Amino acid sequence: MPFSHTKIVGPAGRYGARYGMGLRRKVTAIEVKQRGKHRCPSCRSLVRLERIAFGIWRCPKCGFTFAGGAWTPQTIMGKALAPEELKEVEAQKAKWKEAVK
């Protein structure tokens, strides 16, 4: 079977004329985000993360497995909370370094 979609319709081209244009546009938007390159939270490399199951992602470079969003590795809410969590982690690292000294 030849390539199932074109540049214009993207991944939703496999549906042909079925389901309506609105739904096919939504599917295209979701799948382009899902299959795009994302940063691994462990090694910080920009790679195409593998979706293992619903909300479970794995980095092909370092093998790190983590929980994320259903269709994208990081949700909008997760991005909003990430800076706060980073501050906490940095504070814990600083305390640990002081305790070791």
Swiss-Prot record:
The entry sums up its family as follows: Belongs to the eukaryotic ribosomal protein eL43 family. Putative zinc-binding subfamily.
Q: Which cofactor does it need?
A: Zn(2+)
Keywords annotated in UniProt: Metal-binding, Ribonucleoprotein, Ribosomal protein, RNA-binding, rRNA-binding, Zinc, Zinc-finger
Describe its assembly.
Part of the 50S ribosomal subunit.
State how the cofactor is bound.
Binds 1 zinc ion per subunit.
- GO function terms (MF aspect): large ribosomal subunit rRNA binding; structural constituent of ribosome; zinc ion binding
Is rRNA-binding included in the keywords of this UniProt record? yes
**GO CC annotation: what is one?**
ribonucleoprotein complex
Sites where the protein binds Zn(2+): 40, 43, 59, 62
SUPFAM superfamilies noted in UniProt? Zn-binding ribosomal proteins
- ZnF segments: C4-type: 40-62
| Protein's recorded name | Large ribosomal subunit protein eL43
Give me any GO biological process, just one.
translation
What is known about what this protein does? Answer: Binds to the 23S rRNA.
